[in-house]
């Protein structure tokens, strides 16, 4: 009776080694795959973050892809000026120059008859004259009292360029476009040897029931908050302040039993708009108990505390907060680099890969 292995035993041993090797490879592959769930109330900047991932981690938008956004740029621009003109009626604001009333009538006629993806010289002229009117500007300065696209001034101030016959949207123009996200948008990219799958979920509450099957096995949640929402009402629920709506949603996500082991990254977004607004619109609109100054630093720190205090598991769960401007590529690049390091530290060190 010798100790030599039979041919069958050797084959079995080889098979066993191969299975172990495959399992190890699969384990490494799984460890390198990062699932990110982007959550937040409507218009908090989630889709802009996704666009930035394409710009930062892929080749960005090709000229052909940029051209496809032309119709959206025009639609956003036209809808913005229409929203302001309609709000003037509700807020009882008159045109500084009464001749603009004819332009307003013309705007509605031309907007209804212009082919999608085109901006005629006549329509551009009407919009330009309206935008320069003192009454229109007065109404624009009260935009917290009605729903207006954040990019309204960006496009309207640049009407000469975007209405030009040879206009092709820039990457920044594309970043500023607003199209309501419905359903789930999945984006894949590689960064720091990790394979990211990012899921952008429709922000409006009517869409939230669609999130559920995205949750399983998610590595981290990036929760976006529009800081500038503190003095707005929400489109779907005129009774609830936008910031309170975000806090309510964050509470339900942060303390959800499914996310006990999930890293929660909080993006307090639109910091640029917040910095402008806080000079003239008091934080007490949203937080009556706030007794601090209306400086950006103090007000922003207070909002951060309000969100972080919602975490009921402070002893075991850390919230990683970043102030962001989703339309600023350098800022998003810097923040996402820090976010990736947190993901590596929290989720991947155990595998011995990093």
From Swiss-Prot:
Keywords: Cell cycle, Cell division, Cell membrane, Cytoplasm, Cytoskeleton, GTP-binding, Hydrolase, Lipoprotein, Magnesium, Membrane, Metal-binding, Mitosis, Myristate, Nucleotide-binding, Nucleus, Palmitate, Transducer, Transport. It is a peripheral membrane protein; Lipid-anchor. One of its GO terms (biological process) is regulation of mitotic spindle organization. SMART domains: G_alpha (SM00275). Myristoylation at Gly-2 is required for membrane anchoring before palmitoylation. Its main location: nucleus. Residues 324-329 are annotated as: G5 motif. Residues 173-181 are annotated as: G2 motif. Its EC number is 3.6.5.-. Disulfide bonds: none annotated. It is found in: Nucleus; Cytoplasm; Cell membrane; Cytoplasm, Cytoskeleton, Microtubule organizing center, Centrosome. GTP binds at residues 43-48, 150-151, 175-178, 200-204, 269-272, 326. Residues 32-354 form the G-alpha domain. PROSITE patterns: G_ALPHA. A lipid is attached at residue 3 (S-palmitoyl cysteine). It catalyses: GTP + H2O = GDP + phosphate + H(+). A lipid is attached at residue 2 (N-myristoyl glycine). Pfam families: G-alpha. Residues 35-48 are annotated as: G1 motif. Belongs to the G-alpha family. G(i/o/t/z) subfamily. Guanine nucleotide-binding proteins (G proteins) function as transducers downstream of G protein-coupled receptors (GPCRs) in numerous signaling cascades. The alpha chain contains the guanine nucleotide binding site and alternates between an active, GTP-bound state and an inactive, GDP-bound state. Signaling by an activated GPCR promotes GDP release and GTP binding. The alpha subunit has a low GTPase activity that converts bound GTP to GDP, thereby terminating the signal. Both GDP release and GTP hydrolysis are modulated by numerous regulatory proteins. Heterotrimeric G proteins are composed of 3 units; alpha, beta and gamma. The alpha chain contains the guanine nucleotide binding site. Part of a spindle orientation complex. Identified in complex with the beta subunit GNB1 and the gamma subunit GNG1. Identified in complex with the beta subunit GNB1 and the gamma subunit GNG2. GTP binding causes dissociation of the heterotrimer, liberating the individual subunits so that they can interact with downstream effector proteins. This is Guanine nucleotide-binding protein G(i) subunit alpha-1. It comes from Oryzias latipes. The lineage of its organism: Eukaryota, Metazoa, Chordata, Craniata, Vertebrata. The gene is gnai1.
């Amino acid at each position: 009776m010798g100790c030599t292995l039979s041919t069958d035993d050797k084959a079995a041993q080889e098979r066993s080694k191969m299975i172990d090797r495959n399992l190890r490879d699969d384990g490494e592959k799984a460890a390198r795959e990062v699932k990110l769930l982007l959550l937040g109330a409507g218009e908090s900047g989630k889709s802009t973050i996704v666009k930035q991932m394409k710009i930062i981690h892929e080749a960005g938008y090709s000229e052909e892809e940029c051209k496809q956004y032309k119709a959206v740029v025009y639609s956003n621009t036209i809808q913005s000026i229409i929203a302001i003109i309609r709000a003037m009626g509700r807020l009882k604001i008159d045109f500084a120059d009464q001749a603009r009333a004819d332009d307003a009538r013309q705007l509605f006629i031309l907007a209804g008859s212009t082919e999608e993806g085109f901006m005629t010289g006549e329509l551009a002229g009407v919009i330009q004259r309206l935008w320069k009117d003192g009454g229109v500007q007065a109404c624009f300065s009260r935009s917290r009292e009605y729903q207006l696209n954040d990019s309204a001034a960006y496009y309207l101030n640049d009407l000469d360029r975007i209405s030009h016959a040879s206009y092709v949207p820039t990457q920044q123009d594309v970043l500023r476009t607003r199209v309501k996200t419905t359903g789930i948008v999945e984006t894949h990219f590689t960064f720091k040897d990790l394979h990211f799958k990012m899921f952008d979920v429709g922000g409006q509450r009517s869409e939230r029931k669609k999130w559920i099957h995205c949750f399983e096995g998610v590595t981290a949640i990036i929760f976006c908050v529009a800081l500038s929402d503190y003095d707005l009402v929400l489109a779907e629920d005129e009774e609830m302040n936008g910031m309170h709506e975000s806090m309510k949603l964050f509470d339900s996500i942060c303390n959800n039993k499914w996310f006990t082991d999930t890293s929660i990254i909080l993006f307090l977004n639109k910091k640029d708009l917040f910095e402008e607004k806080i000079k003239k619109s008091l934080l007490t609109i949203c937080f009556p108990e706030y007794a601090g100054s209306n400086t950006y630093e103090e007000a922003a720190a207070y909002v951060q505390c309000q969100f972080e205090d919602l975490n009921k598991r402070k002893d075991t769960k850390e919230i990683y907060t970043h102030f962001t401007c989703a339309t600023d590529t350098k800022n998003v690049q810097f923040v996402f680099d820090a976010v990736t390091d947190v993901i590596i530290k929290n989720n991947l060190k155990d595998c011995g890969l990093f």
